[in-house]
Design a protein with these regions (language model features):
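Rhodanese-like catalytic fold shared by cysteine-dependent sulfurtransferases
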Residues: 1-20, 24-63, 67-113
Length: 113
């Protein structure tokens, strides 16, 4: 699996590149805060969610979870590769690395409801 660094991911977001960004954590963590443009990818629904949002198996997909010790984005990448997706990258540093760098996060407004 190919990885992507924080700086590479930030540059892609800043440029508005066309790619799908998924946080591979349960919804409650996603709603607390997530990276800009990210969509939630529950670890128990990888195939269903991605195939609906990204039907093109060659589209670029970036996955992340909490930090470099969190295995869920790696598991999701393996599952997506088995489904025929060919352009998957993992942001290994994850949400923690992004926060530690002081980069912007998005809070789901439903978190307070």
């Amino acid at each position: 699996m190919v990885t992507i660094t924080r700086d590479e991911l930030k540059a892609k977001l800043d440029r508005g590149d066309d790619f799908a960004l998924f946080e591979v954590l349960p919804l409650m963590y996603f709603r607390k805060h997530h990276l800009p443009t990210a969509k939630n990818l529950p670890p128990t629904a990888v195939a269903e969610v991605v195939s609906e949002i990204v039907p093109d198996r060659s589209a670029e997909i970036v996955l992340y979870c909490w930090d470099d010790d969190c295995p869920t984005s790696g598991w999701a990448a393996t599952e997506l590769e088995a489904m025929g997706y060919t352009n998957i990258r993992e942001y290994v540093g994850g949400k923690k690395d992004w926060i530690d760098a002081g980069l912007p996060m998005v809070k789901d407004p439903r978190q307070d409801s």
